[in-house]
């Protein structure tokens, strides 16, 4: 045989191996295991050794232990989502209750009539109100007192700083 034909045969074989190596050597047939017989939570698995290899690379001693582990893994991920949902259900209302307080209150204007009877007796709380004069008042009471003193020339723009 000529040397050139040996090299060409070797080249063809190497190309074939390179093209089909993944399917020929790496991928094993993926079997779908029916876990329905093992779904009852009271059943215990036997200790017989008929190994089942999972896609995660872990080997289980038989179908029953594989299905139990799969069910527990599915349950733990579902429990994780339940925990996340529960935490979000607790945290989100507190966060948005404080964050959107101004947008909820922006729909109603301060009732300045209740401050006419006791003028200039305001608390020092910080719940800012923006007036149409561009000034930020520390709270509704201070705003209403300024509005009454200015003979209603100042009007309410929105809750929050200007």
Swiss-Prot record:
It is found in: Membrane. SMART domains: KAZAL. Disulfide bonds join 35-67, 45-64, 112-144, 122-141, 130-162. Keywords: Disulfide bond, Membrane, Protease inhibitor, Repeat, Serine protease inhibitor, Transmembrane, Transmembrane helix. GO terms for cellular component: membrane. The chain crosses the membrane at residues 6-26, 80-100. Its main location: membrane. Expressed in epydiymis, in the cauda and corpus. Also expressed in brain. It holds the Pfam family Kazal_1. It is a multi-pass membrane protein. The record marks 124-125 as: Reactive bond. Residues 29-86, 106-162 form the Kazal-like domain. GO terms for molecular function: serine-type endopeptidase inhibitor activity. Probable serine protease inhibitor. This is Serine protease inhibitor Kazal-type 10. It comes from Mus musculus (Mouse). The gene is Spink10.
């Amino acid at each position: 045989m000529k040397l050139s034909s040996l090299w060409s045969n070797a080249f063809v074989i190497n190309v074939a191996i390179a093209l089909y190596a993944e399917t020929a050597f790496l991928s094993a047939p993926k079997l779908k295991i029916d876990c329905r017989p093992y779904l009852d939570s009271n059943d215990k698995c036997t200790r017989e050794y008929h190994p089942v290899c999972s896609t995660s690379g872990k080997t289980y001693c038989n179908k029953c232990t594989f299905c139990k582990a799969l069910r527990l893994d599915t349950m733990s991920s579902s429990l994780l989502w339940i925990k996340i949902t529960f935490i979000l259900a607790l945290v989100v209302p507190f966060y948005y209750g404080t964050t959107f307080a101004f947008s909820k209150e922006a729909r109603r204007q301060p009732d300045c009539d209740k401050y006419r009877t006791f003028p200039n007796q305001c608390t020092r709380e910080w719940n800012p109100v923006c007036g149409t004069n561009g000034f930020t008042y520390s709270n509704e009471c201070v705003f209403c007192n300024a509005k009454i003193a200015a003979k209603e020339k100042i009007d309410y723009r929105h809750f929050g700083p200007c």
